[in-house]
From Swiss-Prot:
Subunit annotation: Monomer.
InterPro entries according to UniProt: Creatinase/aminopeptidase-like, Met_Aminopeptidase_Type2, MetAP_archaeal, Pept_M24, Pept_M24_MAP, Pept_M24A_MAP2, Pept_M24A_MAP2_BS, WH-like_DNA-bd_sf
Species assigned in the record: Archaeoglobus fulgidus (strain ATCC 49558 / DSM 4304 / JCM 9628 / NBRC 100126 / VC-16)
Domain of life: Archaea
Cofactor(s) needed: Co(2+); Zn(2+); Mn(2+); Fe(2+)
Sequence positions that bind substrate: 65, 163
PROSITE patterns with a match to the protein in the record: MAP_2
Residues annotated to bind a divalent metal cation 2: 96, 155, 188, 276
Lineage: Archaea, Methanobacteriati, Methanobacteriota, Archaeoglobi, Archaeoglobales
Keyword Amino-acid biosynthesis recorded: no
Pfam families: Peptidase_M24 (PF00557)
Protein name (Swiss-Prot/TrEMBL): Methionine aminopeptidase
Biological function: Removes the N-terminal methionine from nascent proteins. The N-terminal methionine is often cleaved when the second residue in the primary sequence is small and uncharged (Met-Ala-, Cys, Gly, Pro, Ser, Thr, or Val).
Gene that this polypeptide is encoded by: map
Cofactor, free-text remark: Binds 2 divalent metal cations per subunit. Has a high-affinity and a low affinity metal-binding site. The true nature of the physiological cofactor is under debate. The enzyme is active with cobalt, zinc, manganese or divalent iron ions. Most likely, methionine aminopeptidases function as mononuclear Fe(2+)-metalloproteases under physiological conditions, and the catalytically relevant metal-binding site has been assigned to the histidine-containing high-affinity site.
Length: 291
């Protein structure tokens, strides 16, 4: 990894850490979810980076991919378990970070995912198998009496690609990819008091450009032009676009031009906690860009 790339990764992480920590302090009962999402996204820009994807603010049994709609009036409530998962990039070099804010009495659930992340980061180094990382995560979560979510993973990060190989499972697998020096990875344990699996629910506000190709409708062409120019292959929120009629966005997703990211929720309705950091893999350890 050359010095310029490393500097951009570390700067993106530094900016993201500040923005996320400031945003987390604003999460409280009665506050609009949209207010926090817009704050953290705008703060990233103010500090000199760009959002790598829309702020995910998934609450209670929702684990991932919830972002508010334009003019969304929904608010945080007493008792909520709030996951704030945000990304920032500089010239496509991405940092990814998540924290959980507990507005109720779920201290142990929150600690389970946080300690799982700490345990996982302790074993990250060039030459380690992702199965060893998964075991560290699983052991930490099950020690608290909770379950890891088995179908959500940590992941690699590449320029303008926020989910790349390798997948880093939150449990011990029989085989696994070996981490290499210079890899950039996001480790994100999810803990739950449910059965440990997520499924899709209907709501979807996040999309990315999957297969750019000519389309007939004028407004569809305008949407794709805006997406290509501003977000490239990174995910975007419908509320970020000048115009985003549901019927056109849905049609582009059905046709495979856009990829949809529906909200993922714990299938048994269990509460979910999450913590995440981004790491540059090195010989003998790693640099955590978001800590």
């Amino acid at each position: 990894m050359d010095d310029e790339v490393r500097e951009k990764l570390i700067e993106a992480g530094k900016i993201l850490k500040q923005a996320v920590n400031e945003a987390a302090e604003k999460i409280a009962p009665g506050v609009k979810i949209l207010e926090v999402a817009e704050f953290v996204e705008n703060r990233i820009i103010e500090l000199g980076a760009k959002p790598a994807f829309p702020a995910n603010i998934s609450i209670n049994s929702d684990a991932a991919h919830f972002t508010p709609k334009k003019n969304d009036e929904r608010t945080f409530k007493e008792g909520d378990v709030v996951k704030l998962d945000v990304g920032a990039h500089i010239d496509g070099y991405i940092a990814d970070m998540a924290v959980t804010v507990d507005l109720g009495d779920n201290t142990e659930l929150v600690k389970a995912a946080k300690e799982a992340l700490e345990a996982a980061m302790e074993v990250v180094r060039a030459g380690v198998s992702v199965s060893e990382i998964g075991k560290a995560i699983e052991d930490a979560i099950t020690n608290y009496g909770f379950k890891p979510i088995v179908n959500l993973t940590g992941h690699g990060l590449l320029p303008y690609l926020n989910h790349a190989p390798p997948s880093i499972y939150n449990y011990a697998t029989e085989k696994g990819v070996t981490l290499e020096e210079g890899m950039v990875v996001a480790i994100e344990p999810f803990a739950t008091n449910g059965v440990g699996k997520v499924g899709e629910r209907g709501e979807c506000e996040i999309y990315s450009l999957l297969n750019p190709r000519p389309v007939r409708m004028k407004m569809a062409r305008e949407i794709l032009k805006e997406v290509e120019e501003n977000y490239k292959t990174l995910p975007f929120a419908k509320r970020w676009l000048k115009k985003a009629p549901d019927i056109i966005i849905s049609k582009l997703a059905r046709e495979g031009v856009l990829r949809a990211y529906p909200v993922l929720t714990e299938v048994s309705g269990g509460l979910v906690s999450q913590w995440e950091h981004t790491l540059i893999v090195e010989d003998g350890g790693a640099t955590i860009t978001t800590k």
